[in-house]
Each structure stands twice: as C-alpha cells, then as structure tokens.
C-alpha cells in the first residue's frame, strides 16, 4: 500500500518525517509512506504558497500509484485551496482514503460533499510529537492499512452515518460552499486552545446553521488546553454543548473519544459498514 503525504496547511520537518517512516517500517512494513517535498516548504505561516499546496495535494490525489492521502498536520490554510482542489480532482482521486483532522476538516468536508473518496477524521503524522504519539500514528496506520475496527471511535455503530470536526473549523465551514449535508449523521466535535466564551460562541454559530439539518445527534470530544480567562465562565464545555443542543433541538448523545491528543480515534465520514 502506498500512502502519499502532503501539507495543505502548515509545514513539517524532515526529522519528524523520518521518525514516522521508521515507525511505519517496523509496525506496518506493507505500507510505503511517501512524504512529498512540499511538506517541508516554509513560506511565512504556510507550507508553501497556496499554489504550491494546491498542486501537491491535487497531484497526489490524482496519482493512481497512491492508495491513500494522509494530511501531515493542521494549523491553518486548507480552506484557501479546498474549492480549487475539488475542481481539479480526477477519477483516481475517487478511490482513495483521505485521513486527517483539525484544519484538514476543510478538505474532508469538501471531499465528502463532492462524493470523492472516503474522508476520515483521525491521527496525522504530526501526532508523533505528542506524548504517546507512536500509538496515535500506529492507530492511523492500522486503519489505513488494515481497516482495523479497534482504531474506530468506540461509539460508532455499523449502519449509521458519522462526521467529525474541530468545532472552530466547523464554525468557519457552515454557510460556505465546502459544507456537506449532515442529515441523519451523528456529528462529533472537539476543540483545543480556545477560551470557553469562544467555544460557546462557536457552538451558537454552528447550532444556528445546523438546527434544521436533521442531525441524528451530537457527541462532544475532548476540549483541551483551555486558556484561563480573567473571570470564570460559569459553565463547563459539556454544559455549553448540552445547553445549545437543547436550545436548537439537537440530540446530545454524550462524549466522543476524539481530540487534539494522542488518544484521538478514527471517525470515517458517512455510512459505516
């Protein structure tokens, strides 16, 4: 199995790429990981210009030699190329799995809306930098290479539809041409490094857009590294989620085992068989 790796948002390092390749060679020798050189370009905030990031993703996605595309990390930048990318994808792109999370939710959403390939929320190569990161990378490879059900978020049930996003990313997606139809889907959301008031505001925005979308329900993943505000907010992240779900008539289904951490689980978009 050949897995192409690109950076639609921010850059990676060759040293960390070598660590991922070495780990994969030990745990999944049947997988050939190919880090595109674009992953290592640094141009201001981004892994190269918009044109360079777009070209790398489209080239790998359209290359029949690759079975899957693995996004190297998040950050910011994927929304700047997503619409153009979808317009340039050809037949070979339709048979691939696309794996990532965080800012890559922009591309996962766009791919899912366009019916191209199989978008999947899950760990990325950058997670090797975390404590327990080897397990996160191996979990992703177990899914990509073997379709291992143990990699899946534990609440996933066959015969149901799912989607998973970082909440702030989703808040920027709703109301745009990238946003897919989530009718009859269980939506899972997580967040990192946001004040609780910003988390609350994002939930308001997402809920207003999705209150009539026919969601099957919502699960809340981990909300981590919350900055300390100058005064207590007065609600936990779960209480915020429950309040907005109640207000908008969305079934709150409890916790989800996803987040910006090494325990992040795999959530395929769409119908899980």
How should each PLM-predicted stretch be described?
Residues 178-230, 237:
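Internal helical hairpin/lid segments
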Residues 116-175:
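Conserved anion/nucleotide-ligand pocket segment
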Residues 12, 16-17, 161-194:
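Conserved beta-alpha junction segments in alpha/beta enzyme cores
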Residues 34-37, 100, 215-222:
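Short internal beta-strands
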Residues 1-65:
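ATP/NTP phosphate-donor binding region
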Residues 68-83, 101:
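N-terminal glycine-rich "phosphate-gripper" loop used for MgATP/nucleotide binding
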Residues 87-110, 118-124, 247-253:
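Short, acidic/small-residue loops that bind anionic groups at enzyme active sites
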Residues 222-273:
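ATP/nucleoside-binding phosphotransfer catalytic cores, i.e., glycine-rich phosphate-binding loops
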């Amino acid at each position: 199995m050949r897995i192409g790796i690109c950076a639609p948002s921010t850059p990676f390092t060759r040293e960390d790429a070598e660590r991922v390749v070495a780990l994969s060679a030990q745990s999944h020798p049947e997988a050939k990981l190919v880090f595109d050189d674009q992953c290592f370009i640094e141009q201001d905030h981004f892994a190269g210009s918009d044109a360079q990031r777009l070209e790398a993703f489209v080239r790998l996605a359209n290359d029949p030699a690759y079975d899957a595309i693995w996004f190297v990390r998040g950050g910011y930048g994927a929304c700047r190329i997503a619409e153009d990318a979808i317009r340039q994808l050809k037949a070979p792109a339709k048979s691939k799995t696309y794996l990532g999370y965080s800012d890559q939710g922009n591309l996962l959403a766009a791919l899912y809306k366009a019916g191209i390939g199989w978008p999947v929320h899950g760990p990325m190569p950058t997670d090797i930098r975390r404590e327990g990161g080897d397990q996160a990378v191996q979990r992703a490879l177990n899914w990509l290479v073997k379709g291992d059900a143990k990699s899946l978020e534990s609440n996933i049930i066959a015969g149901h539809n799912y989607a998973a996003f970082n909440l702030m990313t989703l808040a920027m997606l709703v109301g745009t041409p990238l946003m897919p139809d989530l009718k009859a889907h269980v939506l899972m959301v997580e967040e990192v490094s946001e004040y609780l008031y910003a988390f609350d505001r994002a939930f308001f925005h997402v809920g207003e857009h999705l209150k009539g979308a026919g969601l099957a329900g919502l699960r809340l993943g981990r909300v981590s590294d919350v900055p300390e505000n100058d005064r207590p907010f007065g609600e936990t992240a779960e209480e915020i989620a429950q309040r907005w779900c109640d207000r908008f008539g969305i079934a709150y289904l409890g916790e989800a085992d996803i987040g910006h951490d090494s325990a992040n689980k795999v959530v395929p978009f769409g119908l899980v068989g």
